[in-house]
A protein has these predicted regions:
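Extended hydrophobic leader/signal-anchor segments used for secretion and membrane insertion
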Residues: 2-191
Length: 191
């Protein structure tokens, strides 16, 4: 995602500036799979389930969470001799999602909206918006930022807005529910 866009994720679908983004064909999400028997090596290859995706107890029937493409999930679900059920895993709220200093109620599948800063663009700063941009302003753009008596100060001056010096990018992996990406560490500076 590029600077100046607003990102939102709804039910695992990425929206940029309010428009749904086409999912990559190989995007994986986690599915809860109730196995009746172990998945054969041949079927694992067909659904592209790697050895590292397999839990240790894979050699016996039971309920497991696997990263699968929608096509692989359909194929596994259609094999009633192997899988009793295949359902998309609904991730709970994560406290460690960006911004970590704000309780948003967001999940990896339902996130945002968040504006991705662009060089020369200005954002209005309030105590509500500050958690989204504080790290960028302080760490990446080397400013002294503080809050005193409910007011925001940048480099000793009271600030109600901030103009970014750099472009920022939003990184997301194809294995959406198993990716350490910008949902966890925020926008990435151009440098």
């Amino acid at each position: 995602m590029v600077p100046g866009q607003t990102l939102e994720i709804k039910d695992g679908i990425v929206y940029l500036d309010g428009k749904a983004n086409k999912q990559p064909d190989n995007v994986q999400t986690n599915y809860v799979v109730e196995l009746l028997q172990p998945i054969s090596a041949e079927l694992r290859k067909e659904i592209r389930l790697s050895q590292e995706d397999l839990p240790e107890q894979m050699n016996r029937p039971g309920t497991h969470i696997f990263p699968l493409t929608p096509m692989a999930a359909e194929l596994l679900a259609s094999n009633k001799a192997v899988a009793q059920s295949v359902e998309k895993y609904d991730y709970p709220y994560y406290e460690w999602l960006y911004p970590m200093n704000l309780h948003t109620g967001w999940t990896v599948d339902n996130y945002g909206p968040i504006w991705i800063p662009a060089k020369g663009e200005t954002v209005q700063l309030t105590l509500e918006t500050l958690p989204f941009y504080e790290r960028l302003i302080k760490v990446y753009e080397n400013n002294d930022l503080s809050v005193k008596n409910g007011a925001i100060y940048i480099n000793g001056e009271k600030a109600e807005s901030y103009t970014f010096k750099m472009d920022y990018y939003w990184m997301m992996g194809d294995n959406r529910q198993n990716s350490a990406d910008s949902r966890f560490w925020g926008p990435v500076p151009e440098d």
